[in-house]
């Protein structure tokens, strides 16, 4: 059964949506190394598809073992925060960004390919008081 089409922010579209009107499916990153997973997720972010980046990070988090697992979880939370922000859910974005920061800070290891300062700055911006 084919996966339901989605928009660039991961929202489901009608089943009969033309392929050119839907976002491409999220690629399977099984078997890719950390550098490639990070690069795929950043490409999605650069193309305005934070939901896809979240899904890539979540794939890695769920399959990871060892000291970097929590860092991948933090990245999945960051991707979700960015998705909520793009959807206009500022409160959800704030909460997820705060959770991502906490998870990243408590991670026992962060993959060397991850630009942790970029992630922290982004999360800080999302969790800042809008007033």
Predicted regions: what is each one?
Residues 1-64, 103-131:
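N-terminal alpha-helical interaction modules that lie
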Residues 43-44, 76, 83:
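Residue-level signature for tetratricopeptide repeat
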């Amino acid at each position: 059964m084919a996966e339901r089409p989605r928009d660039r922010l991961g929202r489901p579209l009608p089943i009969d949506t033309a392929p050119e009107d839907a976002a491409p499916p999220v690629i399977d990153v099984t078997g890719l190394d950390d550098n490639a997973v990070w690069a795929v997720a950043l490409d999605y972010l650069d193309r305005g598809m934070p939901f896809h980046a979240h899904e890539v990070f979540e794939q890695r988090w769920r399959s990871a073992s060892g000291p970097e697992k929590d860092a991948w979880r933090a990245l999945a939370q960051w991707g979700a925060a960015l998705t909520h922000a793009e959807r206009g859910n500022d409160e959800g974005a704030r909460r997820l960004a705060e959770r991502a920061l906490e998870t990243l800070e408590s991670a026992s290891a962060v993959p060397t390919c991850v630009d942790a300062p970029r992630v922290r700055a982004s999360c800080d911006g999302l969790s800042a008081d809008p007033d």
